[in-house]
Every structure is written in structure tokens, then in C-alpha cells.
């Protein structure tokens, strides 16, 4: 089980073009954040802070109910912490998702549902804004945005709140197979 440590540190790895987290004992975690998605401070050495540890706990607890292996849950948790701290501010890309017609207000760490004509899926809220939030894809197989674009597991996108619904409703919206 992965536990945050004050010995962890963030740095940018030029050869891979990715933000890395040094976990100590010669263990490294490569995030899914490339240089074009990072704020300027990500290109220098950064300690793993108390805020990072708090975000780690928040995201890990929220993801604990999902049917993911411990390894995949830890991976997603670290992707979320990295994006929360180092992802560049971006404009919403809500046109990829159907409107729900609601004025839903998600909170950080909450699981939400997004859908379009191709699929529906779970996302975790990384940063909750007034009208839009940065969310990360929780679907292991990714999420199709269009016929030619997709989000991979752990990839972040900013979406207007009127496209989101609570994940608690997802069970009623998902098709079920009757067995027996």
C-alpha cells in the first residue's frame, strides 16, 4: 500500500518529456503529464508537500469504492495529485459531452458521470471551479471523445458543470445483464 512521504519529490525528466515523482529507494513514478500541459514551476525540483499528501488522501479515499487493483488505484491517485498541482489552466472542452440541463456543483474528489453519443464514463473532480472543473478519466479502457479523439486512463480535461451528473445516478443509467 502506497503512503505519502515527505521524502518524495517532483521533477521534470527531459529525456521522457514527463513529470516524475521520486518515491525514494530508487522507485520512480512517471506521470501522464507532458511538458505542454505543465505550469512553469513543474520544470524545477519540487518537494512533495503537505497539500500534495492531503490531495493524495482525498483522491485515494474517493477512488477506494472502484473496482480497481491496488496498483491501478495508486497510479490514478498519483496522476490526480500531479494534475491538481501542476496542470496548466485550460479552457473547458465541454462540446465533447452531452448537456444534462442541470446546475450541478461537484466538489473536489467527487466521482461524476459524463456521457456523449459514443459512451458514458466516470471521472474524478481534481479542481472544482464555479462553472467548470478539471476532471480525470477513471475508465481503464479510456473514454472516446469523438471518432478520432479519446482520453486515456487518468488523463485530465476541463468540463462545464452542466455536462456532469453525480456518479450515484450512473448505476441507474448503465445497462445491466440479467444472469440465470
Swiss-Prot record:
Cellular localization per UniProt: Cytoplasm
Asked if Secreted is a keyword of the record, the answer is no
A GO cellular component annotation in the UniProt record: cytoplasm
Q: Which Pfam families match?
A: ZapC_C, ZapC_N
State the InterPro entries in the record. ZapC, ZapC_C, ZapC_N
- UniProt entry keywords in alphabetical sequence: Cell cycle, Cell division, Cytoplasm, Septation
Q: Which GO terms describe its biological process?
A: division septum assembly; FtsZ-dependent cytokinesis
Q: How does it assemble?
A: Interacts directly with FtsZ.
Q: What does this protein do?
A: Contributes to the efficiency of the cell division process by stabilizing the polymeric form of the cell division protein FtsZ. Acts by promoting interactions between FtsZ protofilaments and suppressing the GTPase activity of FtsZ.
Q: Which family does it belong to?
A: Belongs to the ZapC family.
State the name under which the record lists this protein. Answer: Cell division protein ZapC
Q: Which organism was this protein described from? A: Vibrio vulnificus (strain CMCP6)
Gene it is expressed from: zapC
Amino acid at each position: 500500500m502506497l503512503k505519502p512521504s515527505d521524502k518524495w519529490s517532483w521533477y521534470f525528466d527531459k529525456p521522457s518529456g514527463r513529470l516524475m515523482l521520486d518515491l525514494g529507494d530508487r522507485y520512480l513514478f512517471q506521470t501522464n503529464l507532458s511538458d505542454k500541459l505543465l505550469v512553469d514551476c513543474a520544470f524545477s525540483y519540487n518537494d512533495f508537500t503537505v497539500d500534495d499528501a492531503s490531495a493524495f488522501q482525498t483522491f485515494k479515499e474517493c477512488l477506494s469504492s472502484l473496482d480497481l487493483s491496488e496498483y491501478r488505484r495508486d497510479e490514478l491517485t498519483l496522476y490526480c495529485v500531479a494534475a491538481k498541482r501542476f496542470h496548466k489552466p485550460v479552457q473547458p472542452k465541454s462540446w465533447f459531452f452531452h448537456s444534462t440541463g442541470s446546475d450541478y456543483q461537484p466538489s473536489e474528489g467527487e466521482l461524476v458521470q459524463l456521457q456523449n453519443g459514443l459512451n458514458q464514463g466516470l471521472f474524478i473532480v481534481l479542481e472544482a471551479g464555479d462553472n467548470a472543473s478539471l476532471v480525470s478519466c477513471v475508465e481503464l479502457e479510456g473514454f472516446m471523445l469523438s471518432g478520432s479523439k479519446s482520453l486515456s486512463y487518468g488523463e485530465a480535461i476541463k468540463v462545464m458543470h452542466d455536462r456532469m451528473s453525480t456518479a450515484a445516478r450512473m448505476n441507474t443509467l448503465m445497462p445491466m445483464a440479467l444472469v440465470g
